[in-house]
Regions:
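Hydrophobic h-region of N-terminal signal peptides that target proteins for export
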Residues: 6-17
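Positively charged n-region of N-terminal signal peptides that target proteins for export
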Residues: 1-3
Length: 160
């Protein structure tokens, strides 16, 4: 009986850290959000506000907030090679962990006329847990070892 309980605990731990399915809503280099932000929208009202700040007057993509939530990472103003990519979302302990890769490039005189503001916005299954954002510094093909390579962790309040 004790072995069965231990096996169930191990399965529950592994399941809790399984990657959440994510779907990209938008990704690019032309956001109107020109400061670095990590955002979570759990309601349609919050999502509309984020989308309007990001894209202006265009309509926000539809999201079913009874099932899903939106996570966005905005890189702020950057040089011509700047980019953002959300590489994974997992449940770990009592929080949702969003891992993303950020490529920064300096603004030089030539690139100041064409500001790059990279972003990545995804939809994931809704969770009420706090969300933590982690910048991943590992190479793209080494995400399995993410714990060794996480550089920065930030917590985002769940009041969104």
């Amino acid at each position: 009986m004790r072995q069965c309980a231990c096996a169930l605990a191990i399965v529950a731990t592994v399941a809790a850290q399984a990657p959440a399915p994510l779907r990209t809503l938008a990704r690019g280099r032309d956001s109107r959000i020109t400061a670095h932000h990590e955002l979570v929208a759990r309601t349609a009202a919050r999502w509309q506000l984020i989308w309007h700040e990001h894209a202006g007057s265009s309509a926000a993509p539809d999201v079913d907030f009874s099932r899903d939530m939106v996570i966005g990472v905005f890189g702020g103003s950057g040089g011509p090679d700047a980019s953002i990519e959300i590489v994974g979302v997992t449940r770990e302990g009592g929080s949702v962990v969003v891992r993303y890769r950020e490529q920064r490039s300096p603004l030089d005189r030539a690139s100041r006329t064409a500001t790059i503001a990279p972003f990545h916005i995804v939809v994931v299954p809704a969770e009420r847990m706090p969300v933590r954002f982690v910048v991943v510094t590992s190479p793209p093909d080494d995400l399995a070892g993410h714990a060794r390579h996480d550089a920065v962790q930030r917590a985002t309040p769940t009041t969104c």
